[in-house]
Design a protein with these regions (language model features):
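Bacterial N-terminal signal peptides
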Residues: 9-18
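Secretory/extracellular carbohydrate-interaction modules
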Residues: 67-142
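Short, aromatic/His-centered strand-loop micro-motif at the edge of beta-sheets
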Residues: 141-168
Length: 248
């Protein structure tokens, strides 16, 4: 009996070791005790790039885009040539609405002109002033391909300022499974098959025609470096990988 327990203990230990080394998590936490550290690393890091319209500050609400609610875009991300398949997620809130109210989360980020992303957007459709949806885009050399993920009112509808929402994408090769955080839970939004181009890349966030604040952006998967800073966004672990990130 003792030998069986010994074998079981060894197996569990090895499994936990593999999990911690093969699937780490990296969270840029913009509202916790180390928000300034994460802001500096994300905005001024060696692998960071952003577009010309960018202007970023750290406020009590998190990583905050400027208050220009015109149609100009702001986007920022970190490149990572060796990141392949992973899950990226961010929680955010709108501080001020404009015309389209876009909040973006980027994956396979190469730079500001080459990336994949998915976004919230509000369009006027046949006079409907409250037509919210989630869309996907692929940007190559500054040129876009785009399409719809969902406009299901049970997932995304009537979004408000100063309310926490989230976007999550599980990236597997060229497929991204998208979820939206609304009403205190994650909801499956749909899947995207991106038309080729990028097999690796980093993560980022962006916005257009609204002011947005991001509480955190997190990425996990094989090859993602872990960090040792506890993340306590919204008074709890920022992601489902929070315990793993802490090395527990």
């Amino acid at each position: 009996m003792k030998s069986k327990w010994f074998v079981l203990t060894i197996a569990v230990t090895l499994a936990l070791f593999a999990l911690n080394n093969l699937a780490s998590a990296l969270t840029y936490d913009f509202v916790g005790n180390n928000a300034k550290q994460w802001f500096e690393e994300f905005v001024n890091g060696d692998n960071t790039s952003m577009n010309e319209d960018a202007g970023w500050t750290l406020t009590a609400d998190g990583l905050t885009a400027n208050d220009n609610v015109g149609t100009g875009h702001q986007r920022i991300g970190i490149a990572a040539a060796d990141w392949t398949d992973y899950t990226v997620e961010a929680k955010f809130k709108f501080l001020k609405f404009g015309t389209y109210n876009e909040s973006h989360v980027y994956c396979r980020w190469q730079d500001e002109k080459n990336n994949y992303f998915f976004r919230t957007i509000k369009r006027n459709n046949a006079g409907n002033q409250n037509f919210w949806s989630i869309e996907w885009l692929r940007k190559v050399a500054g040129t876009d391909n785009e399409g719809d993920v969902t406009d299901d009112v049970n997932i995304i509808a009537d979004l408000k300022v100063n309310t926490i929402y989230g976007l999550r994408g599980k990236v597997t090769d060229q497929v991204v499974d998208v979820e939206f955080f609304n009403g205190s839970k994650w909801l499956a939004a749909g899947s995207i098959t991106y038309p080729g181009t990028y097999k690796t890349g980093g993560i980022g966030v962006g916005r257009s025609s609204c002011q947005v604040a991001w509480q955190y952006i997190s990425v996990n998967g094989a090859g993602i470096p872990s960090d040792a800073t506890p993340v306590e966004a919204l008074g709890k672990s920022a992601t489902t990988w929070g315990e793993l990130k802490k090395g527990i």
